[in-house]
From Swiss-Prot:
Notes concerning its domains: The beta-hairpin motif is involved in DNA binding.
Span of the annotated motif Beta-hairpin: 97-120
Organism: Streptococcus agalactiae serotype V (strain ATCC BAA-611 / 2603 V/R)
Domain Helicase C-terminal: 435-601
GO annotation, biological process: nucleotide-excision repair; SOS response
Protein name listed in UniProt: UvrABC system protein B
Length: 663
């Protein structure tokens, strides 16, 4: 077991100081946390600097913090912001590491078994390992996660107990170290040296930790004693410095020792026999044969390799858990006294609630037809009440908190005043009759000023028809539908900001997480059609898209004013009055937010100049030139990966592989 350093403190670095409502919000949140309050809500209007307030709170209470967002894009944005605020602390990123994921499933109607198929993003896997190792080594850690953090991850105790701890002067033979590395799922590869692998050259062992991407460690032996440990550049072997202590964390999160493995295997065998007997009694001979064949193969792999594909389905036995007991998750890697912050909580808490049921219905089918043992049902996400049991202290962050959050606490801390002095937009209702011509006129007014427009519709058909109509009228417009991938979506936002087009139309894509200061008009069609997209919270979120421009204006097209519309307009007007009073008192003139476009697209740079320049004929380069080219590209790849631009990083990697192949 390793000792966690608990003396580190968070150090917030920012050229800004709290302003507007921020000082009061920060003070209240910190006082409540230090006073032991379990739950509170930060109700912050769009553009009031909620992330900065969160950072100030984290720095002042000085607790390890888990920040949960409801999708990878928002998690990536938050990760980048927290990295800037806390450059000297451990800011980690923990999301699903699948680029592509087809879960294992069975469709009885067509007798179709769909095998699990996935593509793992190596960079995100590295970041996940970095998160868990940081949590066990230090206390000044912020982990920004998606709801993947409530999925099973393996026992933190087994993970920590499996750490290989090395120091200069330690008595351990080279071969014993190699055995220890294999036990924690490292692979020996003397040629292709990358994460999770080690290589051996005489009395020198080089290890590439699973949580690193360009630095490895060289362990030099003198007999059966470690002579010294050095940190090196994995590519060039250049020595970066001496190391007094090296903790090598397992290459997988699903760890168990030999004794526990044998216990687990005996339990798996017993469960298999019970399931076979049950199937045979029910006359399900095919299912009985199937579960025996599949399980015996997995047991053989576990005995020989300590691992098998789908090992997570046996995690209940390997962790020593009882039936129905919740799995270990990222939350178990945190110390007991940690802080949780839920970003856009009105969305995120709904996701946390829904994960369990969807997972269980799919797995029950696999169990009923002999593809998995019943214990596979315990490889699952947490139920919401199980998530709640992990909560020591929590802050829900949203402009529109949901009913669930409001039931958890009466402590609501408002943040309405923007540091920029910007007001919530004016909102007006216009009749739907003649809305197309009216909207066209409003768009043209904005376009003449170099401003942009968001339009939100209720149906795909309406969005497509409106897009076609505006194009015919000479408007530069795009429709962003739900099939568009995250990377493309961010590029569309970038093009809107650059003025490649002036109008963006969407359905449920113009609410949380899209902040474009150039947008001065938001048009809401069918505003009086009550429902998920036109309830009070949905309308307030959509109105907020115009709150980053000093000319922000919202038009609701409707034939009547619904209760949701009225409440959304009343709340917006209330905030606007408070903001105007504050500005008048302090002599503030609202200014449109000046936001560099590269900040919005940091995780997806799409400029052609950012692509690696591919040399047409690498064979014409000398070996020394090729090595220099590889080193330069490695640096570019590293920078792209740190910005979470995995598409660009993969392109650079392909160029590097092509260069290496020449040798």
């Amino acid at each position: 077991m390793i000792d966690r350093k608990d003396t580190n403190r968070f150090k917030l670095v920012s050229k800004y100081s709290p302003s507007g409502d921020q000082p009061q919000a920060i003070e209240t949140l910190v006082d409540n946390i230090e006073g032991g309050e379990k739950a509170q809500i930060l109700k912050g209007a769009t553009g009031t600097g909620k992330t900065y307030t969160m950072s100030q709170v984290i720095a002042q209470v000085n607790k390890p913090t888990l920040v949960i967002a409801h999708n990878k894009t928002l998690a990536g944005q938050l990760y980048g912001e927290f990295k800037e605020f806390f450059p000297d602390n451990a800011v980690e990123y923990f999301v699903s590491y699948y680029d592509y994921y087809q879960p294992e499933a069975y469709v009885p109607s067509s007798d179709t078994y769909i095998e699990k198929d996935s593509s793992v993003n190596d960079e995100i896997d590295k970041l996940r390992h970095s998160a868990t190792s940081s949590l066990l080594e230090r206390n000044d850690v912020i982990v920004v996660a998606s709801v993947s953090c409530i999925y099973g991850l393996g026992s933190p105790k087994e993970y920590a107990d499996s750490v290989v701890s090395l120091r200069p002067g330690q008595e351990i033979s080279r071969d014993q170290l190699l055995n220890n590395l294999v036990d924690i799922q490292f692979e020996r590869n003397d040629i292709d040296f990358q994460r999770g692998k080690f290589r051996v050259r005489g009395d020198v062992v080089e290890v590439f930790p699973a949580s690193r991407d360009e630095h490895a460690f060289r362990i030099e032996f003198f007999g059966d004693e470690i002579d010294r440990i050095r940190e090196i550049e994995s590519l060039t072997g250049r020595v970066l410095g001496e190391v007094e202590h090296l903790a090598i964390f397992p290459a997988t999160h699903f760890m168990t020792n030999d004794e526990h493995m044998e216990e687990a295997i005996s339990k798996i065998q017993a469960e298999m026999e019970n399931q076979v007997e049950l199937f045979e009694k029910e006359g399900k001979l095919i299912e009985a044969q199937r579960i025996r064949q599949r399980t015996e193969y997995d047991i053989e792999m576990l005995r020989e390799m300590g691992y098998t594909n789908g090992v997570e389905n046996y995690s209940r036995h390997m962790d020593g858990r009882s039936e129905g007991e919740p799995p270990f998750t990222l939350l178990d890697f945190f110390p007991e006294d940690f802080l949780i912050m839920i970003d856009e909580s009105h969305m995120t808490m709904g996701q946390i609630k829904g994960m369990y049921n969807g997972d269980r219905s799919r797995k029950e089918m696999l169990v009923n037809y002999g593809f998995r043992l019943p214990s596979a049902l315990d490889n699952r996400p947490l139920r919401r009440e199980e998530f709640e049991s992990h909560v020591h202290q929590i802050v829900y962050v949203s402009a529109t908190p949901g009913d669930y959050e409001m039931e958890q606490t009466d402590t609501v801390v408002e943040q309405i005043i923007r540091p920029t002095g910007l007001l919530d937009p004016e909102v007006e209702v216009r009749p739907s009759m003649g809305q197309m011509d009216d909207l066209l006129g409003e768009i043209n007014l904005r376009t003449e000023k170099g401003e942009r427009t968001f339009i939100t519709t209720l149906t795909k058909r309406m969005a497509e028809d409106l897009t076609d109509y505006l194009k015919e009228m000479g408007v530069k417009v795009k429709y962003m539908h739900s099939d568009i991938k995250t990377l493309e979506r961010t590029e569309i936002i970038r093009d809107l900001r650059l003025g490649v087009f002036d109008v963006l139309i969407g359905i449920n894509l113009l609410r949380e997480g899209i902040d474009v200061p150039e947008v001065s008009l938001v048009a809401i069609l069918d505003a009086d059609k009550e429902g998920f997209l036109r309830n009070e919270r949905g309308l307030i979120q959509t109105i907020g898209r115009a709150a980053r421009n000093s000319n922000g204006h919202v038009i609701m097209y409707a034939d009547k004013i619904t209760d949701s519309m009225q409440r959304a307009m009343d709340e917006t007007a209330r905030r606007r009055r408070l903001q105007m009073d504050y500005n008048e008192k302090h002599g503030i003139v609202p200014q449109t937010i000046k936001k560099e476009i590269r900040d919005l697209i940091a995780i997806t740079k799409s400029n052609d100049s950012d692509k690696p320049e591919k040399v047409v004929d690498y064979s014409s380069l000398s070996k020394k030139e090729r090595q220099a080219e590889i080193k330069a590209l490695q640096q570019q790849m590293q920078e792209a990966a740190e910005l979470l631009d995995f598409e660009l990083a993969a392109q650079i990697r392909d160029v590097i592989l092509e260069l290496k192949a020449i040798d």
